[in-house]
From Swiss-Prot:
Needed co-factor(s): Fe(2+); L-ascorbate
Protein name per Swiss-Prot or TrEMBL: Prolyl 3-hydroxylase OGFOD1
Occurrences of domain Fe2OG dioxygenase (ranges): 134-239
Catalytic activity reported: [ribosomal protein uS12]-L-proline + 2-oxoglutarate + O2 = [ribosomal protein uS12]-(3S)-3-hydroxy-L-proline + succinate + CO2
GO cellular component, one term: nucleus
Binding site for 2-oxoglutarate: 169, 230
């Protein structure tokens, strides 16, 4: 149906011929009264409902699929053309990589205007009727374009006022082999995402919508096609916010002081260049200038070769680390490690290594380390730490093991009510340097994310990489450091064989490992038996 857009009063276009207003309707089958009542009843009872015009499912959370959402193919083609003519901007951070248009709220293109009217007037009214949610007229929609290696990782969409999320797909013929599926996650007893239990394949003119809630965890899987683009319009209908369950805090990973170990272990393992005191002084000078350094060929060649051989033999028992809204990678089970790998872990926990790192960085990681300016620095850090810990009950404090304060499972840190300031100060003064570490396996699909509860503190990060010959930055897998509240990277640490990366971070710095995409499979051309790379990851605390 077509009509004319009336000229605005006072406009110089008045009296002149103007473009016809584009009109479109969504599926009559959805608005048919009997069907509408059935859908509303299914929503109310939280029971599945299937019809050729709409499918509603409750597993793992309430979501609906409407095929043939728009009646006119001509309208859809016109809409697609307008969308592809928009300016797209790359969206890139720890959570996603894709291209997005500007907000479509004020676009004047006729087909975009018509779709906006359909969605935020007629369709919003229909959803309000079936869901009994008082949805607002707030317009919140944009266009997204996912191409090869683009993805949006696990998240729940929860933001103040978002009640219903929707996606309208305008894709060429598509199947699961192309990636780009909308993956839905189940949750565990703590309302944390557990695993993918359903994947919806994009389809031309299909609209998916779901209820935004504390359990609506989903992702857009990586697009695997190098020829096709996944084009969609997505947004949210806003309304009264739901009450969130209490924030879940993960159990803290215990930190441990150094293991008593003779300094001879350093001569057995480490490149002699790095044991020269004059060279250590140069390293410290550079580190104190930039708070980071990369020490190449760190381990002796024979030892490094033994470590790599043990990793490539595949005799390590790995366990997956989650939940997927925070991280996804594999961690070695230390009790089952081959001797050479167990010895390497012991090296990084050794007293000799704590002292060596003190010499590299100037940090007080050993009682023998120089501490000329300790009083000012230590008091400042302790003061900040104390202030942060008193705010834990009201702020988004961390459930991230790497970024949490407790050094051990000291029950007094979790006791209720105020504590004795003098007792607290005594504990701080008597505290000893500690560390925590793991051996990790990184391969296609792995990542870590910054999350709402990320908490930071002063710490020294150590990374030693293995098996990453020929690894390219475009594959992902690099460690990125950013300032709180910012997307701009402060530092990127790329995987480099037998290189030791040291990074000192403060309370305003967050880190993540970028999602490893399918470009990384290029590695198999040179190393057919290798999947990804490994790193020894340790964090040291003064």
């Amino acid at each position: 149906m077509n009509g004319k857009r009336p000229a605005e009063p006072g406009s110089d276009r008045a009296g002149k011929k103007v473009k016809k207003e584009v009109m479109a309707k969504f599926s009559d089958a959805v608005t048919e009264e009997t069907l509408k009542k059935q859908v509303a009843e299914a929503w109310s009872r939280r029971t599945p409902f299937r019809h050729e015009a709409i499918v509603m499912d409750m597993d793992p959370f309430l979501h609906c699929v409407i095929p043939n959402f728009i009646q006119s193919q001509n309208f859809l083609e016109g809409l697609q053309k307008e969308l592809l003519n928009l300016d797209f901007h790359e969206k890139y951070n720890d959570l996603y990589k894709f291209q997005q248009s500007d907000d479509l709220k004020k676009r004047r293109e006729p087909h975009i205007c018509a779709l906006r009217k359909i969605l935020f007037e007629h369709f919003r009214s229909w959803i309000s009727d079936i869901s009994k949610i008082d949805l607002e007229s707030t317009i919140d929609m944009s266009c997204a374009k996912y191409e090869f290696s683009d993805a949006l990782l696990c998240h729940d969409d929860e933001l103040e006022g978002r009640r219903i999320a929707f996606i309208l797909y305008l894709v060429p013929p598509w199947d699961a082999s192309l990636g780009g599926t909308l993956d839905l996650f189940s949750v565990d007893e703590h309302f944390q995402p557990k695993q993918i239990v359903k994947s919806l394949i994009p389809s031309w003119n299909t609209l998916v919508f779901f209820e935004v809630s504390p359990v609506s965890f989903h992702q857009v899987s990586e697009v695997l096609s190098e020829e096709k683009s996944r084009l969609s319009i997505s947004g949210w209908f806003h309304g009264p916010s739901l009450t969130r369950p209490p924030t879940y805090f993960e159990p803290l990973i215990a930190r441990s002081p150094h293991i008593p170990q003779d300094h001879e272990i350093l001569y057995d393992w480490i490149n002699p260049t790095y044991l020269d005191m004059e060279y250590q002084a140069q390293i410290q000078e550079e580190f104190e200038e930039s708070s980071e350094i990369l020490l190449k060929e760190f381990l002796q060649p024979e030892k490094f070769a033994e470590v790599c051989e043990a990793l490539e033999r595949g005799r390590v028992e790995w366990s997956s680390r989650g939940p997927p809204n925070k991280r996804f990678y594999e961690k070695a089970e230390e009790s089952q490690l081959p001797d050479i790998l167990r010895d390497c872990m012991a090296l990084f926990r050794s007293e000799a290594m704590f002292l060596l790192l003190s010499n590299f960085t100037g940090l007080k990681l050993h009682f023998l380390a120089p501490s000329e300016d300790e009083p000012e620095d230590k008091k400042e850090r302790d003061a900040v730490s104390a202030a942060e810990n008193t705010e834990e009950g009201t702020s988004h404090s961390s459930s991230e093991p790497e970024n949490s304060w407790a050094a051990t499972s000291d029950s007094s840190l979790q006791s209720e009510g105020p504590t004795d300031p003098e007792e607290d100060e005594a504990k701080k003064e008597s505290s000893v340097p500690t560390c925590q570490g793991e051996l990790r396996h990184w391969k296609t699909g792995h990542y870590t994310l910054i999350h709402d509860n990320s908490k930071t503190e002063f710490a020294l990060d150590l990374l030693l990489y293995c098996g990453c010959e020929g690894w390219e930055p475009e594959y992902g897998g690099f460690t990125s450091y950013i300032a709180k509240g910012e997307d701009e990277e402060l530092l990127t640490v790329n995987p480099e064989n037998n290189s030791l990366a040291l990074v000192y971070r403060d309370r305003e710095t967050l880190k993540f490992v970028k999602h490893i995409n399918h470009r990384s499979l290029e590695q198999k051309k040179s190393f057919p038996n290798r999947t990804g790379f490994w790193d020894f990851s340790f964090v040291y605390y003064e």
